[in-house]
């Protein structure tokens, strides 16, 4: 297991050694040519599992919502725009005073895609850690994602402010 710092030092997560950094070409294939590419994208090429992190502070409506409402909003948007979308549940996780929501879903495009989205809100910024497994034969997708979610450790706010001033 390797320890990775995500969301600009807000949290760290343990990820199995089978994951490797995605190349620019792989990122373009996943996210398209016209979007800003996320810095953090890891792939387990053998099992076709992807982990990525993104931040957004552009959507004004999300800034006013609490974490559960954001997860429900994301689920609603996916339901209206993604064919074959199904939500398996929205869960809440608390780590000391930090709270995040976890959204388990699957949908069908060319292949069945299983996803786990961990949503964390800090002031006006929404942080998203998303895991996607595109191999329908991998029945262990839920435990793989669960282990990643359980390994997330939020850094104390004092440490984060110290990092920002250096």
Task: Give short role names for the model-derived ranges.
Residues 14-17, 44-46, 95-97, 120-126, ...:
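Short, solvent-exposed coil/turn segments at beta-strand boundaries
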